[in-house]
Amino acid sequence: MRLFTHGQVLALLAFVNTISAIPSFSTNSYPAHPAEPVSLVSQHQPQAPLGLWTRLRNSVIERVWGVPPQQRHRGGNKHQYPPFSAPASLRTRYGDDVVLRFKLQTADEVKALVEASNILFLDVWSSTDEWIDIRLAKDVVPSLLGLLPKSLQTTHVPLIRDLPQTIYESYPSPFQSSSGHERGFLPSGEPSSDATNIFFENYQPLSVIVPWMRLLASMFPSHAQFISIGSSFEGRDIPALRVGVRPANDQKPRRTLIIEGGSHAREWIGVSTVNYVAYSLITSYGKSKPISTLLEQFDFIFIPTINPDGYVYTWETDRLWRKNRQETSLPFCHGVDLDRTWGFEWNGNVTGDNPCLESYGGDKPFAGVEAHQLAEWVKEQTEQRNAKFVAFVDLHSYSQQILYPYSYSCLSQPPNLENLEELAMGIAKAIRLTNRKTYAVSSACGGLMASQKKKVKSETFLRMESTGGSALDWFYHDFGVKYAYQLKLRDRGSYGFLLPRENIVPTGNEVFNAVMMLGRFLLGKSRAFQELDWDAGFQRPNKDDKPILNDDDDDDNDDDDDDDDDADTNDDGIGRKDDSWVPDEYKGDNDRDESDGGWGFRRLRKR
């Protein structure tokens, strides 16, 4: 008799290792916001015996976390919990830091904000052609505003008002929620079991991810293989999964896609999303004809994080660390930005003399150890394993954008621009019909820079950071991958890099459907492929939603419910307009014209 299913074994491994990997901030600290109480072993419950899985889970929680038995109110069923707040160690590290969003209208505003950020050594979280998010200490706000023009002094809103608390809440909780928002969906649209979903109910540390990947490959050896891309600066393997079914006597070049996340260590949602898509494809092979067809026609390389050293560092030391952990010319400034160190149009001369910058690309092309390892690996696969890389998808956060080449300059256009845009718009539509989340479509330079609009006929692009040396541009231009994209995942800034764990599965649904759309596009117009029931392969959390591939759907008229995380309009949540700590002389009515600030699809290419 089999005691556990495949999913339960994977979940058991993930859960036990996750609990042991949670940072021990304080002996008196507790996880934030438990959605539903967990019945512990030490609590007497005569009404029903606990199953083996439940007892094992609860005993791990009680032993490792030291959670006391839950007490019930007399005559009621409500549970009491000890207070939970960010421990002193987090508050010591992050102090009273906040995250502000500045809305932009002119190139002069961008220039002033860039200069002020460099002077004050501020952490720029994200930037688009409409806004810039900056992390800084509250007591630095007056200094920053004093360096800015009057037009920017009253047009900022706080996104995160208590950074230490928000960071604390991003770590795994030992309380398992039964909320429907945290349940995963298999490609059939049916909710998967709670045991299977334990892995995706929380973000996972590398010490959990690697054994989980190995176990997944061992359970599905016919179409999944655990591999190492190379070694990191600190000697860790760069883990990956190769997923696909290649005919025994097939000598043709094997078309291969790379799905990569975690270049920037603090972007945890990218890591979890790579794992989610890999798991969904692996476990659906043989059950879904479209998915089986994709795995028979392509190899998928899933790399949860190309930056294992940095990712571990975000769990053990600094949740907001971005770069890798290699040494630089300055002993007190570690790390290279692994998305600014690639060889094509590397412009390290912009940051080459300052290793302390977040976007430091190294002192030469491919100075980043892990980027060099991946570049050498794909070359070796092409030369020795007869692989033909046809697509590259680089997952980042945040801002909900689908970006295509080029990143280094808006003055250059890719030769197959029409096809890149067509596919990007199809991916955006698939995402929107999954969870009604709108992703903007743009060239990478347009998504990473701010432009002066309505002032001159030709747009002037200003860089918030170095944009050369990107993986996107190298794979497309130097390595010849015809379809290369960077997806910036949820959200639009309410939480930024600290996206709550409730978003793991919905984001996974969205990117899974994006990958399905990409695969369908790459298969071409062969009748045998087009006649497949592709909608049966897509993940649809709400069965009443429109089919993903309904060609009659009107993108412009479809209801868009994607307004729940607009940080600058949220009066109650983390983006509330609380400006009590902003000097009075910098407060204003914030009544600027925002008529052109919509979130619809934006096609920014220059003709």
From Swiss-Prot:
One of its GO terms (cellular component) is vacuole. Residues 22-174 form a propeptide. Its cofactor is Zn(2+). Residues 202-522 form the Peptidase M14 domain. Glycans are attached at residue 349. Inactive carboxypeptidase that may play a role in cell wall organization and biogenesis. This is Inactive metallocarboxypeptidase ECM14. The gene is ECM14.
